[in-house]
Each structure stands twice: as C-alpha cells, then as structure tokens.
C-alpha cells in the first residue's frame, strides 16, 4: 500500500512505512531470524539444502527451489507477512516481471499495444502453452481459471501453485509514481 514515490518524486524523508520496513528488516537480521545472502549460490543453496525455512521472493524462484528433489513436499506457496502497524499494508507484493511497456521510440505504437493486449494481456491459451513449456506465469487474472493453472504440483504437496500465484497477483496494490 505505501510507495517510495509521491507525485513522481522520491519520498524517503518522513516515509513512515519505509522506516518501519527497514526497522523490521534490521530486527530480523539482528535476531538471526533472517539471513541476507549477497551471493546467489549461497542463497540458492540455503533453499536446496533445507537450511532456509522460507523465502520471500517472486514466483520465478520456484525452479531454483525445485532443483533439490529431496525438498519435494516440504514447500508451499503462500502470501507474505504484512506489517500490522502500517496503514494500507497487505500480504501481497510484486517482485518484478508483471509490467509491459511500449517505448516512445516505437514506430507503430498501435500495433505494439494491440500485440500486448491480445497476447500477454488477453490470451489464456498463450499462458496455457507458456506455463508448461517455459514456466512463464501470468499476472493476467483470467489465466487462473484455465485447466493448466489449476493443475496441482507434486513438489508443492498437491497445491495448485499457479492458480494461487495468479490469485495473489490480483491482490497486489497499485503504487503511485
């Protein structure tokens, strides 16, 4: 619910939600509840070796978690915790990958917009093909109704993870820039 931007300007001074987030992050590190890896290999190893109890990340991390067969059935996809004392805080956020844009340098913006609208922003069938073949998960909400998105995952103990992810995506609050 909160934003580091207000009216197109960075809003860091006096941003109570940001301050509370940083304080909570520091507390989690100081109390050794959370580990902040700066090395990608160590980060992934923490999930694959079972030393991480959880991870707050985008859905694209799933393939890294699934790289360790012995972790099957030990993971599930859930919404994230929220800061109780921050107005507008939710259990949902976006971690990249859900935006499409047309450059101002585009020679045919109408064609580009139409392409995005009818493919990534308008075709459940496209995502039904992309999900099993490329692992591309949609934030296009109607995709959650498809048969492919409702299939369960043995790795995630029978959870319909893709349906849940699209459902969560529909609850991510907008951010004002």
Task: Pin down the residues of each PLM region.
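Stable alpha-helical elements in mature extracytoplasmic
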Residues: 18-25, 43, 61, 108-112, ...
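Alpha-to-beta junction loops
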Residues: 49-58, 73
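C-terminal capping/gating helix-and-loop segments adjacent to ligand/active sites or protein-protein/ligand interfaces
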Residues: 154-177
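Short helix-initiation/N-cap motifs at beta->coil->alpha
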Residues: 35-49
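Periplasmic solute-binding protein
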Residues: 1-7, 22, 88-103, 163
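Extracytoplasmic/periplasmic substrate-recognition and gating elements
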Residues: 28-31, 68-135
């Amino acid at each position: 619910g909160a934003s580091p931007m207000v009216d197109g300007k960075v809003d860091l001074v006096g941003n109570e939600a940001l301050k509370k987030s940083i304080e909570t992050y520091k507390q989690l590190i100081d109390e050794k509840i959370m580990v902040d890896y700066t090395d990608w290999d160590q980060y992934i190893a923490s999930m694959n070796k079972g030393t991480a109890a959880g991870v707050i990340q985008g859905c694209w991390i799933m393939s890294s978690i699934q790289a360790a067969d012995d972790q099957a059935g030990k993971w599930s996809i859930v919404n994230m915790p929220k800061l109780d004392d921050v107005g507008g805080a939710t259990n949902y956020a976006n971690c990249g990958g859900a935006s499409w844009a047309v450059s101002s340098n585009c020679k045919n913006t109408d064609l580009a917009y139409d392409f995005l609208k009818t493919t990534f922003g308008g075709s459940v069938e496209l995502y039904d093909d992309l999900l099993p073949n490329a692992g591309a998960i949609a934030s296009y909400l109607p995709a959650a109704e498809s048969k492919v998105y409702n299939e369960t995952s043995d790795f995630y103990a029978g959870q319909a993870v893709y349906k849940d992810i699209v459902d969560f995506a529909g609850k991510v609050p907008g951010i004002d820039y």
